[in-house]
């Protein structure tokens, strides 16, 4: 599991409007582009879209679901790409890229129909059980 080149199982998540609005509100992000389709379109967007706080949480969930309850996230470096609009699915994939002195590095990519939505590097360690 924690060897360089280990591939994480894919995770597919569908972003319906309820998911997008509820995760924006749960992260206290009240920007209208995340919950008001008319205002998002008026600002040049195709539809409402997922916020970066949700993306960060989903990247963390993806890695910890794979690593298990002993995982301790040390850092997440994240870059956004194309938007994740309502009614699209993001597929998360990942690979272990380094293991050094108990620190595991995982590259994560979330892709949707428009391309790479999020690219992240996650560093984690495993707590002693």
UniProtKB/Swiss-Prot annotation:
Top-level taxon in the UniProt lineage: Bacteria
Keyword field contains Hydrolase: no
Involved pathway(s): Steroid metabolism; cholesterol degradation
UniProt GO BP: cholesterol catabolic process
Coiled-coil regions listed: none
Gene3D superfamilies xref list: Hotdog Thioesterase (3.10.129.10)
Catalytic reaction annotation: 3-oxochola-4,17-dien-22-oyl-CoA + H2O = 17-hydroxy-3-oxochol-4-en-22-oyl-CoA; (2E)-octenoyl-CoA + H2O = 3-hydroxyoctanoyl-CoA; (2E)-decenoyl-CoA + H2O = 3-hydroxydecanoyl-CoA
Keywords on record: Cholesterol metabolism, Lipid metabolism, Lyase, Steroid metabolism, Sterol metabolism
Entry function: Involved in cholesterol side chain degradation. Catalyzes the hydration of 3-oxo-4,17-pregnadiene-20-carboxyl-CoA (3-OPDC-CoA) to form 17-hydroxy-3-oxo-4-pregnene-20-carboxyl-CoA (17-HOPC-CoA), in the modified beta-oxidation pathway for cholesterol side chain degradation. Can also use octenoyl-CoA and decenoyl-CoA, with lower efficiency.
Family: Belongs to the thioester dehydratase family.
Protein name as annotated: 3-oxo-4,17-pregnadiene-20-carboxyl-CoA hydratase beta subunit
Classification lineage: Bacteria, Bacillati, Actinomycetota, Actinomycetes, Mycobacteriales
Gene name of the record: chsH1
């Amino acid at each position: 599991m924690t060897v360089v080149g280990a591939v994480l199982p894919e995770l597919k998540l569908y972003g319906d409007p309820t998911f997008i609005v509820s995760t924006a509100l749960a992260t206290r992000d009240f920007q209208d582009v995340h919950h008001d389709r008319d205002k998002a379109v008026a600002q040049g967007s195709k539809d409402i879209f997922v916020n970066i706080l949700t993306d960060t949480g989903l990247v963390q969930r993806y890695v910890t679901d794979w690593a298990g309850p002993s995982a301790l996230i040390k850092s997440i470096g994240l870059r956004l790409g194309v938007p994740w609009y309502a009614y699209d699915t993001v597929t998360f994939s990942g690979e272990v890229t380094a293991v050094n002195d108990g620190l595991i590095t995982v590259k994560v990519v979330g892709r949707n129909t428009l391309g790479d939505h999020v690219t992240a590097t996650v560093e984690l360690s495993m707590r002693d059980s």
